[in-house]
Amino acid sequence: MKLFIILATATLLIAATQATYPRDEGFDLGETQMSSKCMRQVKMNEPHLKKCNRYIAMDILDDKYAEALSRVEGEGCKSEESCMRGCCVAMKEMDDECVCEWMKMMVENQKGRIGERLIKEGVRDLKELPSKCGLSELECGSRGNRYFV
Protein backbone atom coordinates (compact mmCIF):
# COMPACT_ATOMS: atom_id res chain seq x y z
CA MET A 1 0.00 0.00 0.00
CA LYS A 2 2.83 2.41 0.88
CA LEU A 3 4.53 1.62 -2.42
CA PHE A 4 1.31 2.42 -4.29
CA ILE A 5 0.99 5.78 -2.53
CA ILE A 6 4.63 6.65 -3.27
CA LEU A 7 4.25 5.71 -6.96
CA ALA A 8 0.99 7.63 -7.27
CA THR A 9 2.54 10.72 -5.67
CA ALA A 10 5.60 10.51 -7.93
CA THR A 11 3.38 10.20 -11.00
CA LEU A 12 1.36 13.25 -9.97
CA LEU A 13 4.51 15.28 -9.35
CA ILE A 14 5.91 14.39 -12.76
CA ALA A 15 2.62 15.23 -14.48
CA ALA A 16 2.37 18.55 -12.61
CA THR A 17 5.94 19.46 -13.52
CA GLN A 18 5.37 18.75 -17.19
CA ALA A 19 2.15 20.75 -17.20
CA THR A 20 3.78 23.71 -15.45
CA TYR A 21 6.96 23.76 -17.54
CA PRO A 22 6.01 22.83 -21.09
CA ARG A 23 9.07 21.89 -23.12
CA ASP A 24 9.51 21.82 -26.81
CA GLU A 25 11.87 19.30 -28.38
CA GLY A 26 14.68 21.84 -28.27
CA PHE A 27 14.65 25.13 -26.44
CA ASP A 28 12.64 25.44 -23.29
CA LEU A 29 10.02 27.84 -24.58
CA GLY A 30 8.59 28.17 -21.11
CA GLU A 31 5.60 30.42 -20.91
CA THR A 32 7.06 33.04 -23.24
CA GLN A 33 4.67 33.93 -26.03
CA MET A 34 6.20 33.76 -29.48
CA SER A 35 4.48 34.15 -32.84
CA SER A 36 4.14 31.00 -34.92
CA LYS A 37 6.35 32.53 -37.63
CA CYS A 38 9.12 33.18 -35.11
CA MET A 39 8.63 29.78 -33.49
CA ARG A 40 9.30 28.21 -36.91
CA GLN A 41 12.38 30.37 -37.45
CA VAL A 42 13.74 29.50 -34.00
CA LYS A 43 13.20 25.78 -34.65
CA MET A 44 14.89 26.00 -38.07
CA ASN A 45 17.89 27.79 -36.58
CA GLU A 46 18.01 25.94 -33.28
CA PRO A 47 21.46 24.34 -33.76
CA HIS A 48 22.99 27.76 -34.40
CA LEU A 49 20.96 29.49 -31.70
CA LYS A 50 22.29 26.99 -29.17
CA LYS A 51 25.70 28.40 -30.04
CA CYS A 52 24.41 31.82 -28.98
CA ASN A 53 23.57 30.31 -25.59
CA ARG A 54 27.02 28.78 -25.38
CA TYR A 55 28.72 32.03 -26.45
CA ILE A 56 26.96 33.94 -23.69
CA ALA A 57 27.70 31.21 -21.14
CA MET A 58 31.37 31.23 -22.10
CA ASP A 59 31.45 34.99 -21.70
CA ILE A 60 29.72 35.27 -18.32
CA LEU A 61 30.71 31.98 -16.69
CA ASP A 62 34.01 30.28 -16.06
CA ASP A 63 35.28 29.15 -19.48
CA LYS A 64 36.13 25.66 -18.21
CA TYR A 65 32.59 25.14 -16.91
CA ALA A 66 31.10 26.38 -20.18
CA GLU A 67 33.49 24.23 -22.22
CA ALA A 68 32.58 21.10 -20.25
CA LEU A 69 28.89 21.91 -20.56
CA SER A 70 29.33 22.50 -24.28
CA ARG A 71 30.91 19.07 -24.76
CA VAL A 72 28.13 17.38 -22.83
CA GLU A 73 25.45 19.15 -24.84
CA GLY A 74 27.33 18.70 -28.11
CA GLU A 75 27.26 22.33 -29.21
CA GLY A 76 30.51 21.97 -31.13
CA CYS A 77 31.97 25.28 -29.97
CA LYS A 78 35.68 25.19 -29.42
CA SER A 79 35.91 28.86 -28.48
CA GLU A 80 33.79 31.94 -27.87
CA GLU A 81 34.58 33.03 -31.42
CA SER A 82 33.36 29.78 -33.01
CA CYS A 83 30.16 29.96 -30.95
CA MET A 84 29.64 33.58 -31.98
CA ARG A 85 30.07 32.72 -35.68
CA GLY A 86 27.42 29.99 -35.40
CA CYS A 87 25.15 32.37 -33.55
CA CYS A 88 25.57 35.02 -36.25
CA VAL A 89 24.50 32.54 -38.92
CA ALA A 90 21.14 32.12 -37.18
CA MET A 91 20.63 35.81 -36.48
CA LYS A 92 21.27 36.69 -40.13
CA GLU A 93 18.74 34.10 -41.32
CA MET A 94 15.96 35.28 -38.99
CA ASP A 95 13.66 38.28 -39.26
CA ASP A 96 14.53 41.11 -36.85
CA GLU A 97 11.18 40.64 -35.13
CA CYS A 98 11.98 36.97 -34.49
CA VAL A 99 15.48 37.75 -33.22
CA CYS A 100 13.86 40.17 -30.76
CA GLU A 101 11.32 37.57 -29.63
CA TRP A 102 14.07 34.96 -29.26
CA MET A 103 16.17 37.35 -27.14
CA LYS A 104 13.22 38.05 -24.86
CA MET A 105 12.58 34.32 -24.56
CA MET A 106 16.21 33.74 -23.60
CA VAL A 107 16.07 36.30 -20.79
CA GLU A 108 12.65 35.22 -19.52
CA ASN A 109 13.72 31.58 -19.35
CA GLN A 110 16.75 32.44 -17.23
CA LYS A 111 14.97 34.61 -14.66
CA GLY A 112 14.97 32.79 -11.36
CA ARG A 113 17.52 30.24 -12.59
CA ILE A 114 20.68 32.30 -12.39
CA GLY A 115 21.63 35.28 -10.27
CA GLU A 116 20.67 38.86 -11.05
CA ARG A 117 24.28 39.81 -11.87
CA LEU A 118 24.55 37.02 -14.45
CA ILE A 119 21.19 38.00 -15.95
CA LYS A 120 22.45 41.58 -16.41
CA GLU A 121 25.67 40.35 -18.01
CA GLY A 122 23.72 38.03 -20.29
CA VAL A 123 21.37 40.84 -21.34
CA ARG A 124 24.38 43.04 -22.08
CA ASP A 125 25.87 40.29 -24.25
CA LEU A 126 22.55 39.70 -26.05
CA LYS A 127 22.26 43.40 -26.86
CA GLU A 128 25.78 43.41 -28.31
CA LEU A 129 25.29 40.30 -30.48
CA PRO A 130 23.65 41.99 -33.50
CA SER A 131 26.49 44.49 -33.89
CA LYS A 132 29.11 41.77 -33.35
CA CYS A 133 27.41 39.83 -36.15
CA GLY A 134 27.53 42.81 -38.49
CA LEU A 135 23.79 43.41 -38.33
CA SER A 136 22.17 46.79 -38.02
CA GLU A 137 20.91 47.75 -34.59
CA LEU A 138 17.68 45.95 -33.81
CA GLU A 139 14.58 47.98 -33.17
CA CYS A 140 12.70 45.76 -30.79
CA GLY A 141 9.59 46.84 -28.99
CA SER A 142 6.14 47.97 -29.96
CA ARG A 143 7.04 51.66 -30.14
CA GLY A 144 10.25 51.35 -32.11
CA ASN A 145 12.31 51.68 -28.96
CA ARG A 146 15.69 50.06 -28.81
CA TYR A 147 15.57 46.52 -27.55
CA PHE A 148 14.93 46.48 -23.85
CA VAL A 149 14.58 43.44 -21.66
UniProtKB/Swiss-Prot annotation:
Q: Which family does it belong to?
A: Belongs to the 2S seed storage albumins family.
Which region is the signal sequence?
1-22
Upon changing C133S, the result is:
Decreased IgE-binding activity
A Gene Ontology biological process in which this protein takes part is: shoot system development
Region IgE-binding, residue ranges: 121-128
Feature type site, description Critical for IgE-binding activity: D125
Q: Which organism is it from?
A: Fagopyrum esculentum (Common buckwheat)
What disulfide bonds does the UniProt entry report for this chain?
A: C38-C98, C52-C87, C88-C133, C100-C140
Q: Which Gene3D superfamilies match?
A: Plant lipid-transfer and hydrophobic proteins
**Effect annotated for changing C100S:** No effect in IgE-binding activity
Transmembrane regions listed in the UniProt entry: none
Q: In which tissues is it expressed?
A: Expressed in seeds (at protein level).
Q: Which InterPro entries match?
A: Bifun_inhib/LTP/seed_sf, Napin/2SS/CON
Instruction: Give the protein's biological function.
Output: Seed storage protein.
Question: Example GO molecular function term?
Answer: IgE binding
Q: What is this protein called?
A: 2S seed storage albumin protein
One annotated Gene Ontology cellular component of this protein: extraorganismal space
Tell me the superkingdom of the source: Eukaryota
Arranged from A to Z, the UniProt key words for this protein are: Allergen, Disulfide bond, IgE-binding protein, Seed storage protein, Signal, Storage protein
- Industrial or biotech applications? This protein may be helpful in engineering hypoallergens for buckwheat allergy. Determining IgE antibody titer of the natural protein in the blood serum using the ImmunoCAP method could be a reliable way to diagnose buckwheat allergy with a sensitivity of 90% and a specificity of 89.6% using a cut-off value of 2.74 kUA/L.
